[in-house]
Regions:
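Juxtamembrane/disordered regions of integral membrane proteins
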Residues: 1-183
Length: 183
């Protein structure tokens, strides 16, 4: 797994590229899909996004690529600054990296990362997608945040543990092959 700062940054980049696409489309289709289609009467979520001229974000319609880019920048910054370092520290408080089987330790890191990143990114999403046309109310923001955490946490936990992280670890191992050292 990552051994230096460059490799950690690349690992975070690979993770965020896959994760952001998964969560943006999960959010659009599963969390907000029925509401979006009810607004315009479109028969599909993509048809609705086309009819509206984008996705409502920060009080205006933004093209889907803008949504992915904004969430990518937020997620990468959070992952590098908070997610990876804090999740490793949290996992190290429970398990000793030297004495624990690598699969168990990596699972602990994934669980800690989801536990930190899901509420943080859900809060950012609550701010980004807040219905500003109704005015701003802190209680509404907090309620939207809690709703997003409840929707996103199970999806985040299972996709990270069983799909995204195994995929990223396999890609990372292929990209950064280690030459076995002989003694």
């Amino acid at each position: 797994m990552p051994k230096n700062r460059f490799e950690r940054m690349m690992f975070a980049l690979l993770t965020v590229v896959v994760t952001v696409h998964a969560y943006v489309f999960y959010s659009l289709y599963v969390v907000n899909g029925p509401t979006l289609m009810a607004v315009t009467g479109a028969s599909s979520v993509l048809g609705d996004i086309r009819a509206q001229g984008g996705v409502y974000m920060l009080g205006r319609m933004v093209p889907i690529w803008g949504v992915v880019l904004a969430e990518f920048l937020c997620a990468y910054g959070l992952e590098v600054l908070m997610g990876s370092p804090c999740s490793f520290r949290l996992a190290s408080k429970v398990f000793s990296p030297a004495d624990t089987h690598p699969v168990l330790f990596e699972t602990a890191i994934i669980c800690a990362t989801v536990g930190l990143m899901c509420p943080a990114m859900s809060f950012l999403a609550a701010v980004l997608y807040y219905p500003y046309y109704h005015g701003f109310h802190l209680v509404t923001l907090l309620a939207n945040w809690l709703k997003l955490v409840c929707f996103n946490f199970p999806f985040a936990y299972f996709t990270q543990l069983f799909f995204i992280q195994p995929l990223i670890r396999t890609l990372f191992k292929a990209l950064f092959r280690r030459v076995p050292q002989t003694v």
